[in-house]
């Protein structure tokens, strides 16, 4: 690894313990290597998994922890061997900042499935230093794990695409869920689900939103552009919709029954799990075997898919519904996120907040 001319100190907002409360934290960036870029953070989206990590709900958290993996910024320095980016370019950093680069997954541009992947925060860099995320003034990132923000994509809009956007884009491409006219269900209308609706519509699919109440029906159809809306508690309507969908993307991040949704699938239909559920899910097999249906999973996307997501959304003018907040509001934003009180994604204006640069 190379070294900086002088050690660079930055300020971020960190959790110190499982309470998850975030407060200012000053720390040193890792030393810049020949293939690294230094990114000044402009915006960073808030993801539900940030809450999970901050509160140690998976039992794997290390503190102090600076969260944030939907990072958009500007390149301020580059290493001696960086060819991909130039100083002054707008770039993004998603959920991972490293991998082994030699396994079967890495060789197929599926770095997110590498067993040696390095998370953007709450992990350890190759040099032994802790990774810290985007709720901070700057980051040092290997150029391989940085993507370019298209010129016609607003920076604040790009942030949610680096996690929520690629989370739905990747399975749609991998499982060939992009044929115009096919019928796709979106289960759950949160940060990931609302982008699922928009991206599916951009591919030309017929989209049905499935939710536990009708509170979001008007917005789902009139604002997001969904074609149909199902209330999962309405037994009669659910029965009428049986065997009507080619596939369902399940974005719910908490335990829930699967049988009611499997029944909505046509023969050979696929239910793709996208939510990180830390509890066991239970289901009986007849809905699967009697329709040759399948349950699959998908996790974010590789670096090529992440760039493709940004380019696709820029071309199709797919935008997120966001609420931009400052770092001084971040704890309130986390509380609201826990209550599902956001339409549909918080984005933190890091550069506009009072932090050392």
From Swiss-Prot:
Cofactor: Zn(2+)
Top-rank lineage group of the source organism: Eukaryota
Keyword terms of this UniProt record: Lignin biosynthesis, Metal-binding, NADP, Oxidoreductase, Zinc
Residues binding Zn(2+) 1, per UniProt: 47, 69-70, 163
CDD domains xrefs: CAD1
Pfam families associated with the record: ADH_N, ADH_zinc_N
Cofactor notes: Binds 2 Zn(2+) ions per subunit.
EC number of this enzyme: 1.1.1.195
Reactions catalysed according to its record: (E)-cinnamyl alcohol + NADP(+) = (E)-cinnamaldehyde + NADPH + H(+); (E)-coniferol + NADP(+) = (E)-coniferaldehyde + NADPH + H(+); (E)-sinapyl alcohol + NADP(+) = (E)-sinapaldehyde + NADPH + H(+); (E)-4-coumaroyl alcohol + NADP(+) = (E)-4-coumaraldehyde + NADPH + H(+)
InterPro entries referenced in this protein's UniProt entry, alphabetically: ADH-like_C, ADH-like_N, ADH_Zn_CS, CAD-like, GroES-like_sf, NAD(P)-bd_dom_sf, PKS_ER
Enzyme class: oxidoreductase
Biological process, per Gene Ontology: lignin biosynthetic process
Family matches, as Gene3D superfamilies: Medium-chain alcohol dehydrogenases, catalytic domain, NAD(P)-binding Rossmann-like Domain
Entry binding sites for Zn(2+) 2: 100, 103, 106, 114
Pathway: Aromatic compound metabolism; phenylpropanoid biosynthesis
Binding of NADP(+), residues: 49, 167, 188-193, 211-216, 251, 275, 298-300
Subunit and interaction comment: Homodimer.
Protein family according to the UniProt entry: Belongs to the zinc-containing alcohol dehydrogenase family.
Chain's role: Involved in lignin biosynthesis. Catalyzes the final step specific for the production of lignin monomers. Catalyzes the NADPH-dependent reduction of coniferaldehyde, 5-hydroxyconiferaldehyde, sinapaldehyde, 4-coumaraldehyde and caffeyl aldehyde to their respective alcohols.
Protein name in the entry: Probable cinnamyl alcohol dehydrogenase
Annotated source species: Pinus taeda (Loblolly pine)
């Amino acid at each position: 690894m190379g070294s900086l001319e002088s050690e660079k100190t930055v300020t971020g907002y960190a959790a110190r313990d499982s309470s998850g409360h975030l407060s200012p934290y000053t720390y040193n960036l890792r030393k810049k290597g020949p293939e690294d870029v230094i990114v000044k953070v402009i915006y960073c989206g808030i993801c539900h998994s940030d809450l999970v990590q901050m509160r140690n709900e998976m039992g794997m958290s290390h503190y102090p922890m600076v969260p944030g993996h939907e990072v958009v910024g500007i390149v301020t320095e580059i290493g001696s061997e960086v060819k991909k980016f130039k100083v002054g370019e707008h770039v993004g950093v998603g959920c991972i900042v490293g991998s082994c680069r030699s396994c079967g997954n890495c060789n197929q541009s599926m770095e997110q499935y590498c067993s040696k992947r390095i998370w953007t925060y709450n992990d350890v860099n190759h040099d032994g230093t802790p990774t810290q995320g985007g709720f901070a003034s700057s980051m040092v990132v290997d150029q391989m794990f940085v993507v370019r923000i298209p010129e016609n994509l607003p920076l604040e809009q790009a942030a949610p695409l680096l996690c929520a956007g690629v989370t739905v884009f990747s399975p749609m491409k991998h499982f060939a869920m992009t044929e115009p006219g096919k019928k796709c269900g979106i289960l759950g209308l949160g940060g990931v689900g609302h982008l699922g609706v928009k991206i599916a519509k951009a591919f030309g699919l017929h989209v049905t939103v499935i939710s536990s109440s009708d509170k979001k029906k008007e917005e789902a159809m009139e604002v997001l552009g969904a074609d149909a809306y199902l209330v999962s508690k309405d037994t009669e309507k659910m029965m009428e919709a049986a065997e009507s969908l080619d596939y369902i993307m399940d974005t719910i991040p908490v335990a829930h029954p699967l049988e009611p949704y499997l029944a909505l699938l046509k023969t050979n239909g696929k239910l793709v799990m996208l939510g990180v559920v830390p509890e066991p899910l239970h289901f009986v097999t007849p809905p699967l075997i009697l329709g040759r249906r399948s349950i699959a999973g998908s996790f974010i996307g590789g670096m090529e898919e992440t760039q493709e997501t940004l380019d696709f959304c820029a071309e199709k003018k797919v935008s997120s519904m966001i609420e931009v907040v400052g770092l001084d509001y971040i704890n309130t934003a986390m509380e609201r996120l826990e209550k599902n009180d956001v339409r549909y994604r918080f984005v933190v204006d890091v550069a506009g907040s009072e932090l050392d640069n």
